């Protein structure tokens, strides 16, 4: 099995090295990752300049682009052999609920949706590396077992690992996405020359985080695994829209 590994924290981030170490004994792994932190890049592509891959001393490929750029190039000519699946992470920080709309980690996995295997996005719910071994364990476990998984084509599996030692993790729960409240207002700053600027604030707290959600599972000490689909159509709105359109002249 051949796996393309990507992330959004950057090619030198500890999480991607940990993911490679977790999977390399069981698969032929190649790493293509941004040359700098691209957190929050979502599914953006770089269209205003050329992309230049550079192979590092450890064999990883660094790219001056986004997480989606990395996977896009990997699946469309940069690699001599097409991977069987894409695995993204390990992100240092949660990708729960609405986070998946902004996450470069999740976006990298989404770009791998055309391959025969499901794509995985792994996140550790911490900015610290203490419990990376826990996330490594579950990445290894889930990816190794993926061939026994019967899911529709183009399924993306979003996995969040609680910030706990392995022995304290209670298990794995199948979850739906929760929802966050609105984020706090951007933080206004003024530079020494008097020019105003803004820092984007932290994401909002969980607003829909009850039982069955990814938020709840992680808070209770479980690994959450949420299947994502690419159909963003809001089917429940069809009735009201159909009636509304019928009344237009």
UniProtKB/Swiss-Prot annotation:
Q: How is the cofactor bound?
A: Binds 1 divalent metal cation per subunit.
Q: Which residues bind a divalent metal cation?
A: 8-9, 39, 91
Question: Which pairs are disulfide-linked?
Answer: none
Q: Please provide the record's keywords in A-Z order.
A: Cytoplasm, Hydrolase, Metal-binding, Nucleotide-binding
Which leading EC class covers this enzyme?
hydrolase
Protein name as it appears in the record? 5'-nucleotidase SurE
Cofactors (names): a divalent metal cation
Record field: catalytic activity: a ribonucleoside 5'-phosphate + H2O = a ribonucleoside + phosphate
- A Pfam family of the record is SurE
Name the InterPro entries on file. Answer: SurE, SurE-like_Pase/nucleotidase, SurE-like_sf
**From what superkingdom does this record's organism come?**
Bacteria
Annotated function: Nucleotidase that shows phosphatase activity on nucleoside 5'-monophosphates.
Gene name for this UniProt entry: surE
């Amino acid at each position: 099995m051949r796996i393309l590994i990507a992330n959004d924290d950057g090619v030198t981030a500890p999480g991607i090295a940990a993911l490679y170490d977790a999977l390399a004994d069981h698969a032929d792994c190649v790493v293509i990752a941004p040359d700098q932190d691209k957190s929050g890049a979502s599914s953006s592509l770089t269209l205003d300049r050329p992309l230049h891959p550079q192979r590092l001393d450890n064999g990883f490929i660094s790219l001056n682009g986004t997480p989606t750029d990395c996977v896009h190039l990997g699946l469309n000519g940069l690699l001599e052999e097409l991977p069987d699946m894409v695995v993204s992470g390990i992100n240092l920080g949660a990708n729960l609920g609405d986070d998946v709309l902004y996450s470069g980690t999740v976006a990298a996995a989404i770009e791998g949706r055309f391959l025969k295997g499901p794509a995985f996005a792994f996140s550790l719910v911490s900015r610290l590396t203490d419990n990376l071994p826990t996330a490594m364990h579950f990445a290894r476990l889930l990816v190794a077992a993926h061939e026994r998984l019967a899911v529709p084509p183009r399924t993306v599996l979003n996995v969040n690992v609680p910030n706990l030692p392995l022995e304290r993790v209670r298990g794995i729960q199948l979850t739906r996405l929760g929802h966050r409240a609105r984020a706090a207002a951007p933080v206004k700053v003024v530079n020494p020359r008097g020019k105003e600027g803004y820092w984007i604030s932290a994401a909002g707290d969980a607003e829909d985080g009850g039982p069955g959600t990814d938020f709840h599972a992680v808070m209770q000490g479980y690994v959450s695994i949420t299947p994502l689909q690419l159909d963003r159509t809001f089917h429940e709105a069809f009735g009201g829209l159909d009636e509304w359109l019928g009344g237009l002249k």
